[in-house]
């Protein structure tokens, strides 16, 4: 490094002349420089003597693996010649080395990305330091993907095979669920006339009830009717 330079000399962009009306020669400050320059103007470092843009690998033109960034190489050690108002000299170093980012910054259109992320450059604005060269700010917004959400399989609590197996195993146990009591014999149900039952007949809840039929051999039921005349009315 040259004597009198700062530690961040690689981040400086040096302008040699043609800076426009009202501006003199000297070091050009950008937002990438951290420390002020004390002493004479810095000279470019030995590794940054090349003029013109760097050679870009052919794979860098494909978009950097599909993330929409490309091969954005850092050119912090190179120098930039002085430019006029809105013009660029031949052989000047460019900070954006990827062609699709340059095209996006020129038209201010979002650069397409195969993974759904769009690189949206904002309008050029002046850097907050002493430099009047325009810089670009990049904003990455994740776009919603159109892939459907995975559907979860709903499992029933009781599979069909298990329910059928349970029903087959419980089939022999049904007679014990409702035990049938023995019925009274048909000849010993009545001991004589009058319909007196010798023993009570126990019926299961599942057995049908038989309706009682009045037979002609049985005496008709006796009904006693008492008629009381109303008070104050005599029947002669």
Curated annotation (Swiss-Prot):
Superkingdom of the organism of origin: Eukaryota
Region labeled Disordered — which residues?
A: 1-73
- Protein name (Swiss-Prot/TrEMBL): Putative uncharacterized protein RUSC1-AS1
Q: Which gene encodes it?
A: RUSC1-AS1
């Amino acid at each position: 490094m040259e004597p009198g330079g700062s530690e961040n000399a690689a981040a400086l962009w040096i302008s040699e002349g043609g800076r426009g009306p009202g501006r003199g020669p000297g070091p050009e400050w950008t937002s990438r420089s951290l420390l002020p320059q004390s002493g004479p103007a810095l000279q470019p470092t030995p590794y940054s003597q090349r003029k013109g843009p760097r050679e870009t690998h052919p794979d860098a033109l494909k978009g950097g693996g599909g993330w929409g960034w490309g091969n954005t190489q850092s050119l912090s050690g190179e120098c930039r010649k002085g430019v006029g108002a809105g013009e660029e000299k031949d052989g000047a170093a460019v900070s954006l080395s990827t062609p699709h980012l340059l095209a996006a910054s020129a038209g201010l259109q979002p650069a397409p990305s195969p993974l759904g992320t769009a690189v949206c450059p904002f309008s050029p604005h002046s850097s907050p330091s002493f430099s009047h060269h325009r810089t670009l700010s990049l904003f990455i917004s994740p776009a919603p993907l159109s892939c459907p959400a995975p559907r979860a399989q709903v499992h029933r609590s009781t599979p069909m095979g298990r329910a059928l197996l349970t029903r087959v195993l419980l089939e022999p146990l049904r007679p014990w669920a409702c035990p049938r009591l023995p019925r009274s014999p048909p000849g010993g149900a009545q001991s004589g006339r009058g319909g007196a039952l010798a023993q009570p007949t126990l019926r299961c809840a599942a057995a049908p009830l038989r309706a009682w039929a009045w037979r002609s051999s049985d005496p008709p039921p006796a009904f006693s009717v008492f008629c009381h005349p109303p008070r104050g009315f005599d029947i002669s």
